[in-house]
Amino acid sequence: MNETRNVLETREKYRSRMNSALGAGIVLGAVGLLAGTLLDRDPLVVLGVGVYWLGVLGYVGIKWRAPVEVRDEREARINREAAELTLDVLAALLIVAAPGLTVLTVTGAWTVPEFYWGMVTMLAVVAMIVGAANWYTERKRS
Amino acid sequence: MNNDLPERRDERGMSQADLAAAVGVSRQTINAIERDRYDPSLELAFDLAAEFDCRIEDMFDPN
């Protein structure tokens, strides 16, 4: 009982540290960006972004070094299902947008702005990353 | 999956939080299992069975 209670307390402690690191990164990053913009000091903007990245790195680092899983199994499953749903939506967008924009361009019906091609390219990159991640995970589990 | 977790917990006078602490998951996870909103992993099912000193199939009914 004490051991499992320790798991919960450790999980809470590390989650709190992760959130603090990320929260501090976001707040200080925004302050730096705002101060840099208002005072017209580029170094402050760069510093703000640096602090923000440090916060994100802190979040990931603390999660990585945590001696217990920072999410319990139900929370991990919620995360997996949400990620799966997100990928389904992105896949649907890619399936509809890529051929649709191609047809519009080829027929000359609409000159598709670069922005939309950029989005389709990004969706294609995400699809490739998902494929590679699936391949890697499949290998790990087989 | 149907289960008699609430009854077993009540018999012991345990709250959801007590049981959660005993098996190392969140109280919300115990609540979700009891309400048949989440099926526990095999590992957690074994931990729950051990906590109540019974077999998994005594506690969970897949039908």
Language model segments and positions:
Chain B
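Short basic helix-loop element that most often maps to the first helix and adjoining turn
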Residues: 3-22
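Short amphipathic recognition helices of helix-turn-helix/homeodomain-type DNA-binding modules
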Residues: 59-63
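Recognition helix of helix-turn-helix/homeodomain-like DNA-binding domains
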Residues: 25-38
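Residues in the helix-turn-helix
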Residues: 18, 29, 58
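DNA major-groove recognition helix of helix-turn-helix/homeodomain DNA-binding modules
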Residues: 43-58
